[in-house]
């Protein structure tokens, strides 16, 4: 069985972390490179940067952030936000990203995913899916894709879309439950499992983590290959080491061998 991965996520806007990271010894909690270095030292398996810069004029800042992070960190780096064309992916990979996450552009043009996977390899193409439950009480579970930060309904079935994306070459699915995001009530396990069981690519579960048990549930019950969380790590509620130790104690296979993440 593949080892489960723990992935912190940083929202970056105009080169700054939007939700500050509460590491005591950080010189500048708003500097994504400082935050990334802290997570690298703490034993995170990967790191996700989400560039939420509104203006395309400021896109160059994320390339600088990635380049500086890649120089100083050894964990794989996934970058998403504003990826619309092959040239964007090329620039991100050249800057030092290991994987690139495609969201709205994949919904608008599924063939873009196939083109990207063909050019760069499916191992570095992640498709980010934001899904909301649309089925009512007593109906079979059904989720739809939403875009533009969960504001725009597409009418596209989330499970079918995930299948299509993996068929087109996505090497991984970053799955966020819009219903659970920010609630600290745990992942939408039914959604996560439905998509994990429908595709042959790993699922990164996202949205709703409030406790360490939620991380265990994402892997054990949701069949995800990785768990993503933000606030529980950023604000010091739990450390990466505590998360991994808790997951290992629950019987999940974890990477616990680096100096930064020994329980």
Swiss-Prot record:
Instruction: Keyword check for Lyase, yes or no.
Output: yes
Q: What does the record give as the reaction this protein catalyses?
A: 5-[(5-phospho-1-deoxy-D-ribulos-1-ylimino)methylamino]-1-(5-phospho-beta-D-ribosyl)imidazole-4-carboxamide + L-glutamine = D-erythro-1-(imidazol-4-yl)glycerol 3-phosphate + 5-amino-1-(5-phospho-beta-D-ribosyl)imidazole-4-carboxamide + L-glutamate + H(+)
Q: What is its main location?
A: cytoplasm
Molecular function in Gene Ontology: imidazoleglycerol-phosphate synthase activity; lyase activity
Catalytic residues, chain numbering: 11, 130
Q: What is its EC number?
A: 4.3.2.10
Compartments where located: Cytoplasm
Question: Which keywords belong to this entry?
Answer: Amino-acid biosynthesis, Cytoplasm, Histidine biosynthesis, Lyase
**Origin: domain of life:** Bacteria
GO cellular component assignments: cytoplasm
Named in its record, the pathway it takes part in is: Amino-acid biosynthesis; L-histidine biosynthesis; L-histidine from 5-phospho-alpha-D-ribose 1-diphosphate: step 5/9
Concerning SUPFAM superfamilies, the annotation shows:
Ribulose-phoshate binding barrel (SSF51366)
The top EC class is lyase
Biological process (GO) annotations held by this record are: L-histidine biosynthetic process
Q: Where are the transmembrane segments?
A: none
Reported function: IGPS catalyzes the conversion of PRFAR and glutamine to IGP, AICAR and glutamate. The HisF subunit catalyzes the cyclization activity that produces IGP and AICAR from PRFAR using the ammonia provided by the HisH subunit.
Quaternary state and partners of this protein?
A: Heterodimer of HisH and HisF.
Q: Which HAMAP family match?
A: HisF
Q: What is this protein called?
A: Imidazole glycerol phosphate synthase subunit HisF
């Amino acid at each position: 069985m593949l080892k489960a991965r723990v992935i912190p996520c940083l929202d970056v806007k105009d080169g700054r972390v939007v939700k500050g990271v509460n590491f005591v010894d950080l010189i500048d909690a708003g500097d994504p490179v400082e935050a990334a270095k802290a997570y690298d030292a703490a034993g995170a398996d990967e790191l996700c940067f989400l560039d939420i810069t509104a203006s395309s004029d400021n896109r160059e800042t994320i390339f600088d952030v990635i380049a500086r992070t890649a120089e100083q960190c050894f964990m794989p780096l996934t970058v998403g936000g504003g990826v619309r064309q092959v040239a964007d992916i090329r620039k991100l990979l050249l800057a030092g990203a290991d994987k690139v996450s495609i969201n709205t552009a994949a919904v608008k043009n599924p063939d873009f995913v196939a083109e990207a996977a063909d050019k760069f390899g499916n191992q570095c193409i992640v498709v980010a899916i934001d899904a909301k439950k649309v089925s009512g009480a007593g109906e079979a579970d059904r989720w739809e894709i939403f875009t533009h930060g969960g504001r725009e309904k597409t009418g596209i079935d989330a499970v079918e879309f995930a299948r299509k994306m993996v068929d087109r070459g996505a090497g991984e699915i970053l799955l966020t439950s819009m219903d659970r995001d920010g609630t600290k009530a745990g992942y939408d396990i039914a959604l996560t499992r439905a998509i994990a069981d429908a595709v042959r690519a790993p699922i990164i579960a996202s949205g709703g983590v409030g406790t360490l048990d939620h991380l265990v549930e994402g892997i054990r019950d949701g069949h995800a290959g990785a768990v993503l969380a933000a606030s529980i790590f950023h604000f010091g509620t739990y450390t990466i080491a505590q998360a991994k130790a808790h997951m290992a104690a629950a019987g999940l296979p974890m990477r616990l061998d680096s100096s930064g993440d020994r329980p």
